Every structure is written in structure tokens, then in C-alpha cells.
Amino acid sequence: MSTEGGFGGAGSSDAQQSLQSFWPRVMEEIRNLTVKDFRVQELPLARIKKIMKLDEDVKMISAEAPVLFAKAAQIFITELTLRAWIHTEDNKRRTLQRNDIAMAITKFDQFDFLIDIVPRDELKPPKRQEEVRQSVTPAEPVQYYFTLAQQPTAVQVQGQQQGQQTTSSTTTIQPGQIIIAQPQQGQTTPVTMQVGEGQQVQIVQAQPQGQAQQAQSGTGQTMQVMQQIITNTGEIQQIPVQLNAGQLQYIRLAQPVSGTQVVQGQIQTLATNAQQITQTEVQQGQQQFSQFTDGQQLYQIQQVTMPAGQDLAQPMFIQSANQPSDGQAPQVTGD
């Protein structure tokens, strides 16, 4: 053991003073040892013998060996504790910690064999006080239009937000299913329908300039749309609504007319078991022609075309007839 370490001075602490006088005091105690002093040890001899028996080469242990080994271990532990306590006082603490012992082992060469046994606790990086949160700007509503057809075709859904295309997916559907598509260019036609009291269904439609938009449904199939219900508390709820295709068999939308016009139409079905659709609104320069059949009965359709900004005053066309025998529904044209 050694007393080196640069301790001492007028301003030395109690631990440093005890360390300076440690080895002279130990040497004096060793010289004054008697046989009675070896009978009682501060460290239990049973543990010392157990440690010594861990070596496979040790077959027998003499009676004096555990006693001397216990005395040496006591001196070693006392010196290491004093050196660790110096580090504790430097950090202005009153409790000896594992890191203090590791620092004492690191600073003094005679304890190098303990570096792997008592490793120094490395400084861990500080934990983040606040987690990184990704803020997502609420996206504007994506507008779509739907088309119903009886022949197999591809479904192409394209959403546009602020003039840029964001998503695109293509898949194949079976005959009689709903086709939903979003063109990259064209005007937007919101269509609002009221189904029953307090129930409102809004379908936003868009089509390219100069192209016709058609929606057809085969016999027996259903069309599912989302309807908005305004409750008594003012909350808006969206629930799916199924419309029987036998009640709405053909829906035809003609080509848009030139100029800015507002077409407002009121559609009323006469079937007793059908749901009542009372209002359809078409905006931004497009004209709508619609026809509804149920079996052999053709329901009346009333449409009014007025320039944008003027009040609704005159009806446009009303027709009621039986469905032709060839199964093709007559088109309703506007004057």
C-alpha cells in the first residue's frame, strides 16, 4: 500500500487527514498484535474460507491463513473507503456511493486490478424533457365524383389538395359495383339531397371540361352514400344510407353548358315504398338531366335553369311516361 496521492495541506479535510495517518497507525497495530488478537476478527472467517475454497487447486487450508487473510482484507477495505470518501467530500455529499469507489480505483494505480470489477458509471445522456411531436396540418376536404356502371372496369381514386395530386390507387371491381374517380382537371359540382326530415346527403361531384358524367345502376343493386344528420344539440353525424337501385335506376348527367349558370332542380319520386329525395343542387356551370324508374313506372322530373345570381322562377321540363319495352329508359332533355 502507498500513501501517495497528493493529499495534505492546511485546508485538508478529515478524510485526507485520516488517510495521511492511516499507514503509520496500521503498522503500529501490526507490531503490537498478540495471539489473542487473532481469535476475534472483524471479518467473519467462514466467508474468508469460502472464498479461498473457490480455487480448485486449494486442497487444504491451514488455520493461520484465514486469519491473516481477514486482517489483510480489513486493511485494504479501510484504505479504499478513505480514498472514496475524499471524492464524496469533493462533491459535497454525505453519502458514499458506488461511483465514489470507482473514482478512487481509477485515480490510484494500486487499485488497477479492480477496474473491471467495479467499473465507473459513465455519464448517461440526459433524457429529453419533451418528446418531439409532429404537428399535422388539417387537410382540406378532398372532392370526388362517383359513377355507377354494369361492366367490369378499373377504379381510380385520386385526391387533390391545393392543386396537387396526393394519392392514387387502382383496383378491379366486379360488374354492378360503384366506380369512384377523381379527374385532375374539371369543375366541381356539389349535389345536395335531403332524405327524410332532418337528414341531408351531400355528394360532391367533379368532371373534366367537355365530358359527360353518367351514373348507372343495375337492377337489384344498392348504392351507399354518407348522410349528414344534424341533431337537436347541433352536432353533425355521418351515417351510411343505402338507396335501392330499383328506385333510382338511371341517373344521367349531360355535358356542361357554356358560361356560368346555376341549375337547381327539385326531384320528387312517386313510389310509396321509396325514400323521398326532395332537393338537388348543381353549381358551377353544369346542367343535370335525371331519370328515375321503378319497374314500368317513370317518375316525373322537374329542373329549372337560371343564370347565376338570379332567382329561381320558371320550371324547365316535366315528363311522366311508362318505360319502353326494350328496357332502355327515355332520356329527359331540357328546352
From Swiss-Prot:
Family named by the database record: Belongs to the NFYC/HAP5 subunit family.
Transmembrane segments: none
Keyword 4Fe-4S part of the UniProt annotation: no
GO molecular function: DNA binding; DNA-binding transcription activator activity, RNA polymerase II-specific; protein heterodimerization activity
Keywords annotated in UniProt: Activator, DNA-binding, Nucleus, Transcription, Transcription regulation
Taxonomy, superkingdom: Eukaryota
Database matches in Gene3D superfamilies: Histone, subunit A
PANTHER family: HISTONE-LIKE TRANSCRIPTION FACTOR CCAAT-RELATED (PTHR10252), NUCLEAR TRANSCRIPTION FACTOR Y SUBUNIT GAMMA (PTHR10252:SF8)
Listed SUPFAM superfamilies: Histone-fold
Subunit organization: Heterotrimeric transcription factor composed of three components, NF-YA, NF-YB and NF-YC. NF-YB and NF-YC must interact and dimerize for NF-YA association and DNA binding.
InterPro entries found in the cross-reference section: Histone-fold, Histone_H2A/H2B/H3, Transcr_DNA_Rep_Reg
CDD domains (alphabetical): HFD_NFYC-like
GO BP field: regulation of transcription by RNA polymerase II
Location of this chain's protein in the cell: Nucleus
UniProt-recorded name of the protein: Nuclear transcription factor Y subunit gamma
Function: Component of the sequence-specific heterotrimeric transcription factor (NF-Y) which specifically recognizes a 5'-CCAAT-3' box motif found in the promoters of its target genes. NF-Y can function as both an activator and a repressor, depending on its interacting cofactors.
One cellular component (GO) term of this entry: nucleus
Taxonomic placement: Eukaryota, Metazoa, Chordata, Craniata, Vertebrata
A Pfam family: Histone
